[in-house]
């Protein structure tokens, strides 16, 4: 059963890492690394380019690896990576599948820190202005990402967020609920 509310969507997810590796034509010699990862970046597919990754995926992976809290890999052959840049101010992290529920809160901490580090330089500039012709120009940055995580019963759930930065705390709350079984 799917749930959707203000920029946040949660629904069951059934596709396995094995199926993703088959779809992405991952060579046998690269599969072990991906299977052994705590977190796997998956393609998001935009406008007919099904094997493409979000614009900030590689930067986020580099950031996550620098933190050293979990092993992250990308589900893509080394020779075939397609990074899609879209013209907007939105931070597009992409889709990530977590191997265990335990990784969820750690991963969320890294995601929220990464987003904060990106928007921190913009925050002092974001001030409410009452009389503006185009108020969207002054809005806070937006972010989109998807996290596939096993819940406390072992069923995978996909959490999709696409909205303003100030609303991402809801995702952390959902992750805690899913992984604690509450």
Task: Identify the function of each model-found stretch.
Residues 54-56, 86-88, 172-176:
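Surface-exposed beta-strand edges and their flanking turn/coil or helix-capping segments
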């Amino acid at each position: 059963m799917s749930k959707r509310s203000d920029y946040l969507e949660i629904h069951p997810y059934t596709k396995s890492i094995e199926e993703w590796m088959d779809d992405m034509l991952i060579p046998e010699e690269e599969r072990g690394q991906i299977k052994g990862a705590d977190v796997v970046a998956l393609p998001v597919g935009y406008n007919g380019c099904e094997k493409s990754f979000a614009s900030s995926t590689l930067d986020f992976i580099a950031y996550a690896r620098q933190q050293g809290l979990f092993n992250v890999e990308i589900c893509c052959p080394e020779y075939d990576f397609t990074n899609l840049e879209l013209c907007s101010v939105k931070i597009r992290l992409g889709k990530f599948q977590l191997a265990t529920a335990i990784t969820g809160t750690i991963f969320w901490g890294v995601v929220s820190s990464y987003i904060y580090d990106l928007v921190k330089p913009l925050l002092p500039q974001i001030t409410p202005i009452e009389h503006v012709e185009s108020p969207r120009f002054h809005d806070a940055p937006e972010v989109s990402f998807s996290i596939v995580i096993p819940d406390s019963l072992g069923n995978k759930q996909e959490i999709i967020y696409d909205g303003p930065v100030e609303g991402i705390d809801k995702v952390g709350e959902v992750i805690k609920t899913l992984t604690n079984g509450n």
